[in-house]
Design a protein with these regions (language model features):
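Histidine- and aromatic-rich ligand-binding microenvironments
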Residues: 8, 40, 96-97, 118
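Active-site neighborhoods of divalent-metal-dependent phosphate/nucleic-acid chemistry enzymes
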Residues: 59-63, 71-117
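Alpha-helix capping/helix-boundary segments
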Residues: 11, 43-44, 84, 103, ...
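Short, well-structured N-terminal submotif of metal-dependent ribonuclease cores
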Residues: 1-39, 53-68, 124
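Generic structural signal for small/hydrophobic residues in well-ordered secondary structure
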Residues: 8-9, 47, 88, 107
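Acidic, PIN/NYN-like endoribonuclease modules and their adjacent C-terminal/linker elements
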Residues: 2-4, 104-132
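Conserved beta-strand segments of alpha/beta enzyme cores
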Residues: 36, 76, 128-129
Length: 132
């Protein structure tokens, strides 16, 4: 299976808004050179919700931002599948955020590296060889 990197929502947002100081340099290089980079479909909802609630400011309308932040930028939208939902509900409930559990399950399903600065992710033994 080719190496894929799954971006947590905040990493995706920082990349698209060029807020590079938040992303470790090694990660940025790995993301730029990876054969495949993707985000969980739930990340689109997470961005939309955060924008609606005023927790983040987008430089353009949401629909335009989402379109530009995906394929034109080289980011693949990874679908939410039944297998991913089953993995997510079967994870040990370390992380209470269902969005993050779906992102973790997406990375596991794709056997992908996961780029996230969420400190709870490292508590999942399943992610031991997958976290960047």
């Amino acid at each position: 299976m080719p190496e894929i990197i799954v971006l947590d929502t905040h990493i995706w947002f920082w990349l698209m808004t060029q807020d590079f100081q938040e992303i470790p340099d090694l990660w940025q290089t790995a993301i730029e050179t990876a054969p495949q980079v993707g985000v969980s479909a739930i990340s689109c909802y997470e961005i939309a919700l955060a924008s609606q609630k005023g927790r983040l400011e987008l430089p353009c309308p949401l629909s335009e931002w989402l379109k530009e932040a995906l394929l034109p930028s080289g980011i693949e939208l990874l679908p939410l599948t039944p297998e991913i939902t089953i993995r997510a509900v079967n994870l040990v409930p370390i992380h209470k955020d269902p969005f993050d559990r779906l992102i973790i399950a997406t990375a596991l399903e794709y056997e992908a590296k996961l780029a996230s600065v969420d400190n709870l992710f490292s508590k999942y033994p399943e992610l031991e060889n997958y976290l960047m």
